Regions:
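A residue-level marker of the well-folded mature domains of exported/periplasmic proteins
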Residues: 1-203
């Protein structure tokens, strides 16, 4: 949606790191794609400069932007909710599951930082959108949204609620690619989706 706002004719090519034997970098090089949104942050097992949104010119990485999580703000709000009694839980027999917390930019728990590759004029535009999201004046998941089959998934005067966003199993009509099948995933990815309950697994 962000890409379409800048260029309505642009296409987003999606590849999944969790698929077995998937050489994403080679595919993007073959297609001439050099603007990439990669993993959100550096991980201990895979230290790399390729994270966040960046331009990859023949192996030279130029960072544009990346998300950041302020865990101090998150835990502060979590503890405050417990002390105030607003923290809730659902019990199912001997199982206890905490409710989801929809804390975004307006809470201070999530933000965005800019890389050296993002010019000052573009930063002004991103800042404008960022402040609009924080104030609730701009909702990214609003307006008419169509899936790859051309079906309307959200009407022009509607906004997807958080549950609908997190449960999205479809891709926008400007996206090239697909959601992988369970059997296409690597063993680590299969374990992740089963533990997180991201998809229903039929044995």
């Amino acid at each position: 949606m962000g890409v379409r706002a800048v260029n309505p004719n642009a296409k987003v090519y999606v590849e999944w790191a969790g698929i077995k034997d998937n050489d994403i970098e080679a595919k993007f090089q073959e297609l001439g794609i050099n603007c990439i949104s990669d993993q959100d942050m550096i991980t201990p097992k895979k230290s790399s400069r390729k994270f966040g949104l960046y331009i990859n010119d023949d192996g030279m990485v130029k960072h544009l932007a990346m998300p950041v999580w302020h865990w101090g703000a998150f835990y502060e709000k979590l503890i405050q909710s417990i002390l105030s009694g607003s923290w809730k839980k659902e019990e199912e027999g001997d199982k206890v599951s905490a409710l989801n917390y929809w804390w975004g930019m307006s809470s201070g728990a999530v933000d965005i930082i800019y890389g050296g590759g993002l010019n000052s004029e573009t930063r002004k535009i991103v800042d404008l959108v960022r402040h609009s999201i924080i104030k609730g004046e701009f909702m990214p998941f609003s307006g008419e949204l169509k899936n790859q089959a051309g079906e309307i998934m959200n009407k022009a005067d509607e906004t997807l609620d958080p549950d609908e966003v997190i449960e999205m199993d479809w891709l926008l009509d400007n996206v090239v690619g697909k959601v992988p099948e369970y059997d296409e995933l690597s063993d680590d990815s299969k374990l992740l989706v089963m533990n997180q309950g991201i998809i229903d697994v039929n044995e």
